[in-house]
């Protein structure tokens, strides 16, 4: 059943040219449970940020595809719960492609230093270097610390993506 679900999701996303779903890509697919208790979570995004109407459009198309597939198994659309959504703030970046739309935003990044130790910094994503290549890097401007009421600037950090363990966009207060 898991393979049928994945096939339906990818089929719908591939067929979105010229529709509300154009430009949408799959971030992650999570399937929990089985039979009548199956819960399907589809996280999608675009390079400019996905809209609610796009999620609703894709949800309808994916549900239609799954219902056709499930009829052959004797199940109906009432036998599964489908949620199509955006990863949103507070969710870790999964795909390298997601970074581009977050340039300028505040991030909390956990990464491995050259010596193998782990470090966490918060700062603004300023740039993505060589995004199409293996040695891609992020340029993070760390949040400055305040000393005696004055903000002290911190130097930008360039982090290789292969050393990034977790990167989470955060809301600015």
UniProtKB/Swiss-Prot annotation:
Gene designation: rimP
Superkingdom field: Bacteria
Protein keywords: Cytoplasm, Ribosome biogenesis
Annotated localization: Cytoplasm
InterPro entries to which the protein is assigned, alphabetical: Ribosome_maturation_RimP, RimP_N, RimP_N_sf
Family: Belongs to the RimP family.
GO CC field: cytosol
SUPFAM superfamilies (UniProt xref): YhbC-like, N-terminal domain
Gene3D superfamilies assigned to the protein according to its UniProt record, in alphabetical order: RimP-like superfamily, N-terminal (3.30.300.70)
Native organism: Chlorobium phaeobacteroides (strain DSM 266 / SMG 266 / 2430)
Principal localisation: cytoplasm
UniProt function note: Required for maturation of 30S ribosomal subunits.
One Gene Ontology term from the biological process aspect of the record: ribosomal small subunit assembly
Lineage start: Bacteria, Pseudomonadati, Chlorobiota, Chlorobiia, Chlorobiales
Pfam family, one: RimP_N
HAMAP family reported for this sequence: RimP (MF_01077)
Protein name: Ribosome maturation factor RimP
Keyword Cytoplasm: yes
């Amino acid at each position: 059943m898991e393979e049928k679900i994945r096939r339906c999701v990818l089929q719908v996303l591939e067929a979105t040219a010229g529709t509300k779903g154009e430009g949408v890509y799959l971030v992650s697919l999570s399937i929990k449970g089985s039979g009548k208790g199956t819960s399907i979570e589809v996280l999608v995004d675009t390079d400019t940020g996905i809209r609610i109407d796009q999620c609703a459009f894709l949800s309808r198309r994916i549900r239609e595809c799954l219902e056709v597939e499930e009829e052959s198994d004797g199940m109906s659309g009432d036998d599964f719960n489908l949620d199509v959504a955006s990863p949103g703030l507070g969710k870790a970046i999964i795909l390298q492609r997601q970074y581009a739309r977050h340039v300028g935003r505040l991030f909390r990044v956990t990464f491995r230093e050259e010596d193998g130790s782990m470090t966490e910094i918060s700062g603004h994503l300023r740039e993505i270097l060589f995004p199409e290549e293996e040695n891609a890097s992020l340029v993070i401007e760390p949040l400055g610390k305040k000393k005696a009421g004055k903000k002290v600037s911190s130097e930008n950090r360039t982090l290789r993506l292969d050393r990034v363990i977790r990167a989470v966009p955060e809301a600015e207060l």
